[in-house]
């Protein structure tokens, strides 16, 4: 009897362990897929900014006109159900933040998330790296009052001095 119970317990233990590992792998795979999506979306947005900058270089518009056109583009550019973009200058001044025109033009460098992280500083640092980077922080979703865990990808568009990003809530 004792030997049978030991076997049942051992099998049960390994089934639970196997399920837990598989669940973690599925979650990791989902996050990896989301990471690839947001990186691709930011790279696409930056390539659109690059096309605008090329028009500036060709003398078709001033740098200020190109930046305004770029900001207007990012403000309206969406993907999926609720994907949007934002941009901050390398100094932390917000250029575009979806649904938050009240923030545009304001320096967000000292902004902290719910855990005391200077998330704008981290986003700017990650964006300045060659190839951009990912940052995890807490942010309040539009229409909500409680901050949620968020993972973002950011990339510097050097000609405008903007760090462009998007992210997903975990």
Language model features: what each stretch is:
Residues 1-170:
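N-terminal membrane-sensor/transducer module of prokaryotic signaling receptors
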